[in-house]
């Protein structure tokens, strides 16, 4: 009986983790991969759900194990998605004029595409650096900015599509 509960638990974790990844893939424009994962996901769901429901009155622990698997699956899906880092992002950096030029050079030396535009702060002129990059490079770019000893305001946004640009083609 314990192995049956383990099967329900781990199959549900796998199914929900796949659901999370499928959702992310589809929202990022990866329809084919999302559809393939969806097929696997629904196959697991049908098998697990039917096996839980077929004897739920006699063995209500199945329901608890199923719910625990669902909960852990959500967490695992988020962890896996974070590691895969599928997609693109935009990092906006606002800093002083002189620091902006220096930071742009530092980033460009690391093969990061940077567009620099003039910006107006409350007290002084600023530079805004606009960086479009793969999500996999997020931590590297943020560490580079923070490690440069330049006072900067950083914002990061996930984006769906970028056309053209430096260093972000698939």
UniProtKB/Swiss-Prot annotation:
Cellular compartments per GO CC: plasma membrane
Membrane topology: Multi-pass membrane protein
Signal peptide extent: none
Record keyword Membrane present: yes
Pfam family, one: DUF5698
Listed transmembrane segments: 1-21, 36-56
Membership in a protein family: Belongs to the UPF0316 family.
Protein name: UPF0316 protein CLJ_B0679
Species this protein is from: Clostridium botulinum (strain 657 / Type Ba4)
